[in-house]
C-alpha cells in the first residue's frame, strides 16, 4: 500500500499506485492482490491508480480493462467491473465491489495518461 487515508483514526481509503507503459499482467496482479487482500484486512475502499506512459493510451485502456474484467480476484466479486465516465480524455476509470468476510467494499481502478 502506498498511502492509507484516515479520518479520526479510521481507515477511509487505500491508494496503490503503479507506473505502466504496457499491460504487464504479473506486475498488475501483484498490485491488485496487495491492495485488496494483503494490506486490506478491514475492507477499506481501495483506489488502484496507474500512471500510463503508452504510445496509444486508448488501446492501452482497452487491453487493461479487458485484463481487469477477466482477472481472477482473490476475494469474491459482488459487483462486476464497469467503466466509469471521467472528466477528460487523459483519465479512464472503472469500478467494482468485492467482499471480505461478508463485508462489501468498492475498488476503483483509474489510469492517467502521462505520455509526453
Question: What does each model-found stretch correspond to?
Answer:
Residues 15, 19-36, 79-95:
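Hydrophobic transmembrane alpha-helix bundles
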Residues 13-15, 47-49, 108-110:
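Hydrophobic/aromatic beta-strand patches that form the interior of the parallel beta-sheet core
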Residues 7, 18-21, 111-113:
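Short, flexible loop/turn elements at secondary-structure junctions
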Residues 4-14, 103:
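Active-site beta-strand-loop-beta-strand hairpin of nuclease catalytic cores
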Residues 19-75:
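Catalytic cores of nucleic-acid endonucleases
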Residues 51-116:
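Domain-level recognition of nuclease-like catalytic cores that cleave nucleotide substrates
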Residues 2, 12, 44-46:
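Conserved acidic residues
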Residues 2-4, 97:
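Residue-level detector of beta-strand face positions
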